[in-house]
């Protein structure tokens, strides 16, 4: 057969398959924008700002609608009511991890972020129990965060009030906290291997948040054949996993079955206990993936929030001054801030919450999937369907947060100036797939920011009104622009 004829036949079959799949699924799925054969709704989506496109679609199709990434239908939940009903009220049914082809290529379904079913439940249960045993949610982990905050201050003093890019310094602090749990040690802030690891995580977040990755996720069959930045993600993860494997081997050589030093030891002991179970989820490959997930999630999200937070404090010096006034009044200069202080610092607490609400770090969340056929708001969503939950639609809800596009700590204060909780505050997602380290992340944000502002004034290189706070990436995660500032000792 002539190659040209064969190509035309293949494309025709693909075209007809696309039409059949899209039409056969529409009867059960929510309505949405009409997809084109093969490419779906890609031309109607702004891959530079997916969340904005979904908001526009919701104005036409309501809080539950379907879009197509290539041939694949994706159900989108928009607004607090729909997101809450799915992730909390129907938490078990919506607890699957949805399709994220670029990550799946690297992760192979292992670890905790992108695993599913029995594997995910067993690994998550083990992680939660082990993290609690190593102080998560207890005073002991707070002591570690406070100690790391003091190390961070000493490192910032070494800048001698000169302009500096805070990216890696702010990344080192939360990374060292999670390293103390995983590896039972911490890095020096100038350790080159440490800085290389930080750069790999940082670069991966930037790439994952790029428009190109959204294109790759739309057409996963082409990932292995296309050049582009998605290949750099695989290279970076290979570097990180190589380092993690080195540390695992070190632990294996000195393992004491009766005295676990850290998370890796606990996992290795569990592996030994289940060595005769051929169905065990506790393998070296699983340990590498789990540690890599914890390493990345425990570092990059908190460091990016800190970096964006300082940029906002530079932009709004009047907010910074109020926080420093409250720190001076409640904490003073002779001791470090602690979590007990938070209840006496409503304005500072409001600022920390508003930073997270405003930056909207993961606009469309990590994808979910339904674990069975689900009846949801008069629709039948088939088992395995990928679900996108718009966190932007919750964190930037204009009824709960008037003028949501404005940075305003008043969103979390009542008329008397007391801190005001909000059910709409879900930067860490919600339900069964909620971030395991939420409590630690909140602690780190509060203690790192207050300790920095207790010891330094922040000085911008430009007039505050000229500071650009527009993210340089808006897709998977919102990444702040690069900037420099001076840490002036008080």
From Swiss-Prot:
Protein EC: 1.14.14.1
Pfam family, one: p450
Bilayer topology annotation: Peripheral membrane protein
GO term, biological process aspect, one: linoleic acid metabolic process
Signal peptide extent: 1-25
Pathway participation: Cofactor metabolism; retinol metabolism
Compartment(s) of residence: Endoplasmic reticulum membrane; Microsome membrane
Cofactor(s), by name: heme
Keywords for the protein's UniProt record, in alphabetical order: Endoplasmic reticulum, Heme, Iron, Lipid metabolism, Membrane, Metal-binding, Microsome, Monooxygenase, Oxidoreductase, Signal
Catalysed transformations (reactions): an organic molecule + reduced [NADPH--hemoprotein reductase] + O2 = an alcohol + oxidized [NADPH--hemoprotein reductase] + H2O + H(+); all-trans-retinoate + reduced [NADPH--hemoprotein reductase] + O2 = all-trans-4-hydroxyretinoate + oxidized [NADPH--hemoprotein reductase] + H2O + H(+)
Sites where the protein binds heme: 435
Main location: endoplasmic reticulum
Superkingdom field: Eukaryota
GO cellular component, one term: intracellular membrane-bounded organelle
GO MF annotation, one: heme binding
InterPro entries, alphabetized: Cyt_P450 (IPR001128), Cyt_P450_CS (IPR017972), Cyt_P450_E_grp-I (IPR002401), Cyt_P450_sf (IPR036396), Cytochrome_P450_fam2 (IPR050182)
Family per similarity comment: Belongs to the cytochrome P450 family.
PANTHER family: CYTOCHROME P450 2C18, CYTOCHROME P450 508A4-RELATED
Task of the protein: A cytochrome P450 monooxygenase involved in retinoid metabolism. Hydroxylates all trans-retinoic acid (atRA) to 4-hydroxyretinoate and may modulate atRA signaling and clearance. Mechanistically, uses molecular oxygen inserting one oxygen atom into a substrate, and reducing the second into a water molecule, with two electrons provided by NADPH via cytochrome P450 reductase (CPR; NADPH-ferrihemoprotein reductase).
Name this polypeptide is given: Cytochrome P450 2C18
Species of provenance: Homo sapiens (Human)
């Amino acid at each position: 057969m002539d190659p040209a004829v064969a190509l035309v036949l293949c494309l025709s079959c693909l075209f007809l398959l696309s039409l059949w799949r899209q039409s056969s699924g529409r009867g059960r799925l929510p309505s949405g924008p009409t997809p084109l054969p093969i490419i779906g709704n890609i031309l109607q989506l702004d891959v530079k700002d997916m969340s904005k496109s979904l908001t526009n679609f919701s104005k036409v199709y309501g809080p539950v609608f379907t879009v197509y990434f290539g041939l694949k239908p994706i159900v989108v939940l928009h607004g607090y009511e729909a997101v809450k009903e799915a992730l909390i009220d129907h938490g078990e049914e919506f607890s699957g991890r949805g399709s994220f082809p670029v990550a799946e290529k690297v992760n192979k379904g292992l670890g905790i972020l992108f695993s599913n079913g029995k594997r995910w439940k067993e690994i998550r249960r083990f992680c939660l129990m082990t993290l609690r045993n190593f102080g998560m949610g207890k005073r002991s982990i707070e002591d570690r965060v406070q100690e790391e905050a003091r190390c961070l201050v000493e490192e910032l003093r070494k800048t001698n009030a000169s302009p500096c890019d805070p990216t890696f310094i702010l990344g080192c602090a939360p990374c060292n906290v999670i390293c103390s749990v995983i590896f039972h040690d911490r890095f020096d802030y100038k350790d080159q291997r440490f800085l290389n690891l930080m750069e790999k995580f940082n670069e991966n977040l930037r790439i994952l948040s790029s428009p190109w990755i959204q294109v790759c996720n739309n057409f996963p069959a082409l990932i292995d054949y296309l050049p582009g930045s998605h290949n750099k993600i695989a290279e970076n993860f290979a570097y990180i996993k190589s380092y993690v494997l080195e540390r695992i081997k070190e632990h294996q050589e000195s393992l004491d079955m009766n005295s676990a030093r850290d998370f890796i030891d606990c996992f290795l002991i569990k592996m030994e206990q289940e060595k005769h179970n051929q169905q065990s989820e506790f393998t070296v490959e699983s340990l590498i993936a789990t540690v890599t997930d914890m390493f990345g999630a425990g570092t990059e999200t908190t460091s990016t929030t800190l970096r964006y937070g300082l940029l906002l404090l530079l932009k709004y010096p009047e907010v910074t001054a109020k926080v420093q006034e409250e720190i001076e009044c409640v904490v003073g200069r002779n001791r470090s801030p602690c979590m007990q202080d938070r209840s006496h610092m409503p304005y500072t607490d409001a600022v920390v919450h508003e930073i997270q609400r405003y930056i909207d770090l993961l606009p469309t969340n990590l994808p979910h999937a339904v674990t069975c056929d689900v009846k949801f708001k008069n629709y039948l969503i088939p088992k395995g369907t990928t679900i996108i939950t718009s966190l932007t639609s919750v964190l930037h809800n204009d009824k709960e947060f008037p003028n949501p596009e404005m940075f305003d700590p008043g969103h979390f204060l009542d008329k008397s100036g007391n801190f005001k909780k909000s059910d709409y505050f879900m930067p860490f997602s919600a339900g069964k797939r909620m971030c395991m380290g939420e409590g630690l992340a909140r602690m780190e944000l509060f203690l790192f920011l207050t300790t920095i502002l207790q010891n330094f004034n922040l000085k911008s290189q430009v007039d505050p009104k000229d500071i650009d706070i527009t993210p340089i990436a808006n897709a998977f995660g919102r990444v702040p622009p690069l900037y420099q500032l001076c840490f002036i000792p008080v």
